[in-house]
């Protein structure tokens, strides 16, 4: 425990909190422009072609973001909304694109968990 004299000299340093989505700079979401849309393969036990996009955020930071759901309409220069949230089997992918916002369309014929994928309720 420090003495009062040591506290007068040095003071207490605040705890540094590490953020899991630093590119968002404390915001829940950021807007960005797709610079490249492509597919990658996941880590060892899994096998697929995962859809990802390289996105330049408004602050000028470039991140790799996952495109959730089946099928998408994204291409280069699409304006997207990016949120935090990593994809466990894709190393380096720490962001996800919000479906149904800005240029991204919702998932077609989605029945359950529709709000996560920007899908409207189907007419009976």
UniProtKB/Swiss-Prot annotation:
Part of the 30S ribosomal subunit. Contacts proteins S8 and S17. May interact with IF1 in the 30S initiation complex. This is Small ribosomal subunit protein uS12. The modification 3-methylthioaspartic acid is found at residue 89. It comes from Micrococcus luteus (strain ATCC 4698 / DSM 20030 / JCM 1464 / CCM 169 / CCUG 5858 / IAM 1056 / NBRC 3333 / NCIMB 9278 / NCTC 2665 / VKM Ac-2230). Keywords: Methylation, Ribonucleoprotein, Ribosomal protein, RNA-binding, rRNA-binding, tRNA-binding. Residues 104-124 are annotated as: Disordered. Belongs to the universal ribosomal protein uS12 family. GO terms for molecular function: rRNA binding; structural constituent of ribosome; tRNA binding. GO terms for cellular component: small ribosomal subunit. The gene is rpsL. One of its GO terms (biological process) is translation. With S4 and S5 plays an important role in translational accuracy. Gene3D superfamilies: Nucleic acid-binding proteins. Residues 111-124 have a biased composition (Basic residues).
């Amino acid at each position: 425990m420090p003495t009062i004299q040591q506290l007068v000299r040095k003071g207490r340093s605040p705890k540094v909190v590490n953020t899991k989505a630093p590119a968002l700079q404390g915001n829940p979401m950021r807007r960005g422009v797709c610079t490249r849309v492509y597919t990658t393969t996941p880590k060892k036990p899994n096998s697929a072609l995962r859809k990802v996009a390289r996105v330049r955020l408004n602050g000028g930071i470039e991140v790799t973001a996952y495109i959730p759901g089946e099928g998408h309409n994204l291409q280069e220069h699409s304006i997207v909304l990016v949120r935090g949230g990593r994809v466990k089997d894709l190393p380096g992918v720490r962001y996800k694109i919000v479906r149904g916002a800005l240029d991204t369309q919702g998932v077609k014929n989605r029945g359950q968990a529709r709000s996560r994928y920007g899908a409207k309720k189907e007419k009976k």
